[in-house]
């Protein structure tokens, strides 16, 4: 069976090797006689799955020992509440609003603390990023929140801001849901990172949280115990029953990522190199076209989520129908921005980009 290329923004395509391994182990994991779905989360079989997944993610992302890795639930939307419940101490937080997801974050945080919009790119209709030097950060803020890749608008911070040089003593919180494990992270600049797994790491159901140890233990009294980072960490992410199968698939994905190689580099360095090449190929094709265009500034274009528009919007439905006929799936853009969107996460092979570009050229020639 030849599988189509799936450009969904999330849940998204998974590495075929991971799906094949999961299928082979579905009824009997490593001779246990059980599917992972059937295991007790406190049994030795699942404990080994969990411990390996945690260790592999730490190694893969080069996470320092003073950070805890938590496997939580609720996705990025829940973290928009869980972060202020744990870090705000009921005081204040600064937000850099660069698109739909960071805007949702600041609105949710207002329920728990005083929120200041330190910077926004709304004036550019979320097609540029506000320069860090222009951010109005408060020295006494509990944390600074940045969504480092906006899935809908297709803008990405190519480098993490160093907010200490901007006069802030607050920890930086990053929502890296849609580009986690696509590039290295400078953990010296981060206090907490969170991301749903369903774009780059696995199926929906598990949320990865990486939190510096000194930031735990300060949850508001109203914070549910299951969302208290220290409680979750002290119980090895098993204070409540974790999403066991989602953790298992994420663990298989971590192993797949560790095996990836591009030239003389492996793991995340290889993925960064591969992702840069894939994105550049697609953006170049869009920029050379007379039919398609991308509105995002070249210096902040996302490597993961590539929105593009047709100059003749009346051809949108024909484009999507033709794409489906060419086994190119889920290219429709988000309803808030329209047009098309190709999400080209880690599992999207170069062949998928080439197939999409080939179809785009064919469609343009036909409708010139």
UniProtKB/Swiss-Prot annotation:
One of its GO terms (molecular function) is pyridoxal phosphate binding. Keywords: Amino-acid biosynthesis, Aminotransferase, Cytoplasm, Pyridoxal phosphate, Pyridoxine biosynthesis, Serine biosynthesis, Transferase. Homodimer. This is Phosphoserine aminotransferase. It comes from Polaromonas sp. (strain JS666 / ATCC BAA-500). L-glutamate binds at residue 42. Pathway: Amino-acid biosynthesis; L-serine biosynthesis; L-serine from 3-phospho-D-glycerate: step 2/3; Cofactor biosynthesis; pyridoxine 5'-phosphate biosynthesis; pyridoxine 5'-phosphate from D-erythrose 4-phosphate: step 3/5. The keyword Cytoplasm applies. The modification N6-(pyridoxal phosphate)lysine is found at residue 199. It is found in: Cytoplasm. The gene is serC. Its cofactor is pyridoxal 5'-phosphate.
